């Protein structure tokens, strides 16, 4: 555990040295998550540098290749990243596997659980530190004003009017805001989430069909990302 903590610290330090230059960089990291159900493209937020650096490191190390989306709940999210899920037998309960460290929580009022949000899973710890490897992607649902008000009341931080509008028109899981770190967003292939959540699952929410992933990352010009995926970078 101690060695793993030093490894995470090294990742964070390297990222911190580069962070100023990256803010002015004309390129960004584009993550590709491939499954039999389709491909998702994801951008990672500079507002969550520890999570971004950690995720990119794991992707480059091919940590996620062959792992499963082991927990799938329609109208909520798809979860993966458990290292014990690789080649796991159908009757095995998954979700407890870790890589030996946590990532400190990184909350930003600009980042929220809209549909397609990439967020870090975690256990029940008071600091809300994230799993070092497990993540989920939000499906959620669209909310009417009355039900949304109840959901927002459960959130541990203020949800803005602009964010409420997104929850009403695009969908998401507003009650998780302020409790789990959102560190990325699916910018292409959101329909893949719906395909994955449509699969039958057992009483532990594991899909009856194994849904494996292959994850890669590459640098791409921000202008190209904006043009191809309609993602607008804020200055």
Model-derived regions, located:
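Bacterial Sec-dependent N-terminal signal peptides
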Residues: 1-25
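Cyclophilin-like peptidyl-prolyl cis-trans isomerases
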Residues: 19-235
């Amino acid at each position: 555990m101690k060695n793993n903590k030093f490894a995470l610290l090294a990742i964070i330090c390297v990222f911190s040295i580069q962070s100023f230059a990256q803010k002015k960089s004309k390129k960004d990291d584009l993550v590709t998550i491939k499954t039999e159900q389709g491909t998702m493209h994801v951008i990672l937020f500079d507002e969550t540098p520890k999570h971004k650096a950690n995720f990119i490191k794991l992707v480059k190390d091919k940590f996620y290749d062959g792992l499963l989306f082991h927990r799938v709940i329609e109208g909520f999210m798809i979860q993966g990243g458990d290292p014990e899920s690789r080649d796991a037998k159908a009757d095995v309960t998954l979700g407890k596997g870790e890589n030996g460290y946590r990532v400190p929580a990184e909350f930003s009022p600009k980042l929220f659980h809209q549909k397609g949000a990439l967020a870090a899973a975690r256990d029940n710890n008071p600091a809300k530190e994230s799993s070092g490897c497990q993540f989920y992607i939000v499906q959620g649902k669209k909310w009417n004003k009355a039900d949304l008000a109840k959901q927002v009341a459960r959130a541990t931080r203020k949800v803005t009017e602009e964010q409420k509008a997104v929850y009403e028109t695009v969908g998401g899981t507003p009650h998780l805001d302020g409790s789990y770190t959102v560190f990325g967003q699916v910018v292409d292939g959101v329909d893949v989430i719906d395909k994955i959540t449509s699969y039958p699952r057992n009483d532990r929410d594991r899909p009856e069909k194994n849904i494996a992933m292959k994850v890669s990352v590459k640098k791409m010009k921000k202008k190209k990302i904006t043009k191809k995926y309609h993602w607008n970078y804020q200055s």
